[in-house]
A protein has these predicted regions:
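Walker A/P-loop
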Residues: 2-38
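AAA+/P-loop NTPase substrate/partner-engagement loops
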Residues: 27-55
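A short helix-turn-beta junction within AAA+ P-loop NTPase domains corresponding to the substrate/partner-engaging
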Residues: 30, 124-141, 159-162
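Conserved AAA+ ATPase "SRH/arginine-finger" region at the nucleotide-binding site
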Residues: 36-41, 136-147, 167-169
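Basic, amphipathic alpha-helical bundle interface domains used for macromolecular binding and assembly
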Residues: 159-193
């Protein structure tokens, strides 16, 4: 968020990728939306569309879930390329164009996308143009033996539920705080050597 980039999280289902992003939205107090990418998801389901209002006899814009500050594109590689491409303008320009009108998105803006490994059934490879828009990719693997044993014990003794409660998390900052951090990061000098 401070660097202004987007993140791709990769791992098999069930490792907590979605919970991680929901938790991030909570502690940063950002507007948060989640889109579950599926094979039948259409581009307008992501960005929104113009809708005719019979009462006013005019078109009105129905904003899609991409109109937010923190967007979770869950299992992005389960949707066909046409739907994945709906995020290209969102990620690069931080705007959405509907019926020729451009809508600027609120800052800070970040897409956190999860994807399943390509060897999983029902997945599509992300196009190069989309991969280029991610600042980095994080690989999430199965927990080690000790961590998995600890998780099993938490399930058995009932303490796991409290650990998974996103609503119990306290905000650490907000959009203004993030914007201030971003401004400070612009002043960091990087040695050419």
């Amino acid at each position: 968020l401070v660097a202004g980039g987007h993140v791709l999280l990769e791992g098999v289902p069930g490792l907590g990728k979605t919970l991680l992003v929901r938790s991030l939205g909570r502690v940063l107090e950002l507007d948060f939306n989640r889109i579950q990418f599926t094979p039948d998801l259409m581009p307008t389901d992501v960005t929104g569309h113009a809708m005719y209002d019979q009462k006013t006899e005019q078109f009105r814009i129905r904003r899609g879930p991409a109109f937010t500050q923190l967007l979770l594109a869950d299992e992005i590689n389960r949707a066909p390329a046409k739907t994945q491409a709906a995020l290209l303008e969102v990620m690069q320009e931080r705007q959405i164009t509907i019926e020729g009108k451009a809508f600027t998105l609120n800052e800070p803006y970040m897409v956190l996308a999860t994807q399943n490994p390509l060897d999983q059934e029902g997945t599509y490879p992300l196009p190069e143009a989309e991969l280029d828009r991610f600042l980095f990719k994080v690989l999430i693997d199965y927990p080690g033996h000790d961590d998995e044993t600890r998780l099993v014990n938490m399930v058995l003794d009932g303490t796991i539920r409290a650990s998974l409660d996103v609503d119990s998390l306290s905000p650490a900052t907000d959009a203004a705080g993030l914007q201030a951090m971003k401004a400070l990061s612009n002043d960091v000098l990087i040695d050419a050597e």
